[in-house]
Amino acid sequence: MASTSLLQSTSSSFAGVRFHCRTSAAPRVGLSSFTVKAAAGTAVFVDKAEAETINRLKTNYIEKMVPLLKEEFSYSNILEVPKVVKIVVNCGIGDASQNAKGLDAAINELALITGQRPVKTKAKTSIAGFKVREGMTLGIAVTLRGNLMYSFLDRLINLALPRTRDFQGVNPNSFDGHGNYSVGFREQSVFPEIKPEIVGKARGMDVCITTTAKTDKEAYKLLSLMGMPFREGSGPSTLVRKKKLKSHHFDAKKGRRY
């Protein structure tokens, strides 16, 4: 087995590269990975478990938000506490079938924003009025889960939304009644990964945040604790249809209102 000094001298020219080596002390364990970092001509070996960073939003949720939500809504089991399970980002591209370069540019931009390569969304049926054929590419979409989801949500709340032009808070009534929230963007340049000077065309996108909350009130509280800047002086409200007054009803047989 090579000594540590030999490994250090060998890896000095491969800064930032992750190596895999099999140790003789534990042959059944398998591969043990470490990260090499160069600083002033020296190499520092870091274990893989120590090199992995934990997202701050996920850490705050586990350590601070879960106890607050459990106490406020009187959950008997910690598994009842609502959480974000996935985020779906959709981007519609009307001229995708005629402009292949525009489609590739949109895919690259959404991949930079989300950290995951999107998939193409295609038409399921043909609509002659909109010149849409079955199987035609209409847009792209990304489904985020796990650490990528928390990282994207953190950047969306703290970087993208404040950079929106004339931003006064997101609409608190954009819940779907089942604890899921949607927010839209008119242009992708609000994300810091996209440079406005190199963007060829402004493209909007829709972000749907799916949670395990049973009600909009629970989801509203969850996202508020995460830092979602809801519009002040308002909260989630359910649509209530107004009953028609009797004076609005007209009896055709009698020819009068009642």
From Swiss-Prot:
Of the GO CC terms on this record, one is: ribonucleoprotein complex
| Cross-referenced InterPro entries | Ribosomal_uL5 (IPR002132), Ribosomal_uL5_bac-type (IPR020930), Ribosomal_uL5_C (IPR031309), Ribosomal_uL5_CS (IPR020929), Ribosomal_uL5_dom_sf (IPR022803), Ribosomal_uL5_N (IPR031310)
Q: Where is the transit peptide?
A: 1-38
State a single Pfam family of this protein: Ribosomal_L5_C
Residue spans making up a coiled coil are none
Q: Which HAMAP family match?
A: Ribosomal_uL5_B (MF_01333_B)
Q: What is this protein called?
A: Large ribosomal subunit protein uL5c
Q: Which organism is it from?
A: Spinacia oleracea
